[in-house]
Curated annotation (Swiss-Prot):
InterPro entries: D-isomer_2_OHA_DH_cat_dom, D-isomer_DH_CS, D-isomer_DH_CS1, D-isomer_DH_NAD-bd, FDH_NAD-dep, NAD(P)-bd_dom_sf. Substrate binds at residues 94, 120. Homodimer. NAD(+) binds at residues 175-176, 196, 231-235, 257, 283, 312-315, 358. Keywords: Cytoplasm, NAD, Oxidoreductase. Coiled coil: none annotated. This is Formate dehydrogenase. It is an enzyme of class 1 (oxidoreductase).
Amino acid sequence: MVKVLAVLYDGGKHGEEVPELLGTIQNELGLRKWLEDQGHTLVTTCDKDGENSTFDKELEDAEIIITTPFHPGYLTAERLARAKKLKLAVTAGIGSDHVDLNAANKTNGGITVAEVTGSNVVSVAEHVLMTILVLVRNFVPAHEQIQEGRWDVAEAAKNEFDLEGKVVGTVGVGRIGERVLRRLKPFDCKELLYYDYQPLSAEKEAEIGCRRVADLEEMLAQCDVVTINCPLHEKTQGLFNKELISKMKKGSWLVNTARGAIVVKEDVAEALKSGHLRGYGGDVWFPQPAPQDHPLRYAKNPFGGGNAMVPHMSGTSLDAQKRYAAGTKAIIESYLSGKHDYRPEDLIVYGGDYATKSYGERERAKAAAAAAKSA
């Protein structure tokens, strides 16, 4: 029989009171009865950090590991080396940057890494649009003013703008980035731009009313609002540093619901405090959970606002949790049945090789460059 380890976040009393919070340790993605009825074992924990964590102890003899972007259990090369029985790593959600994919390819004959592709793209896209509006309309300081018992229209309005007539650009135009652009179309923005190595079709560009910019700095210089919708990998880690942020328009807004490590948190906080960035918002942090002294918890613009940060929640609405719980079960069922008939789009690593175009192309390019250098 198979041991399944799930690293999920603690929902506390909320997880106990709301069974639809499937991504919590209280509700375990709805998997326990289904697995135990088949004779399998499910171990669930939220203890994932520090020496001798439950995650580390239980991983050693687990055959399947379930992790989540909202409370990531980092599958480093060192951890994978100790996981002698591990065959399948499932992300309940999307994004497998918490897994050392090179090590997964080489461990135990190749660990399959899969995620529930598409399960929360609508949820994240809606959150992006909400965050843009919250920042541009200066909602948070205005709401805080009311809660404090004050009434000062001018104080709120002096940093409030319309989204109409603004230039908005997305870094990445995959499943989420494209949906963000589609949701922005009715707002009559001056222009919708995107930066991505792979262009949309001419038909999609015409339908959405967007335009590709081949150079990232060129796009940033034009945008009033920039939203990050690309995956985290070696080329995007720390991408938005002090130098790149300086290329953005003074007084622009930056939204990040992709991954916290794509930005340098200290540089974003500095740009916000100086007013170079009028606002920063999103739900992704590095590390996660964010420590109490994380600079993006407290950084504000010179007007006393511009911070729209929340916990990592954009992709874990109750509707999204239904989808990624069902998708996680389907992936595990495919493994347990021996059929391994996974949805191709869910596979990140399979059979000791990359199964996704972007990762595969990137790794092959690195290998080719190394071979050429040594020749």
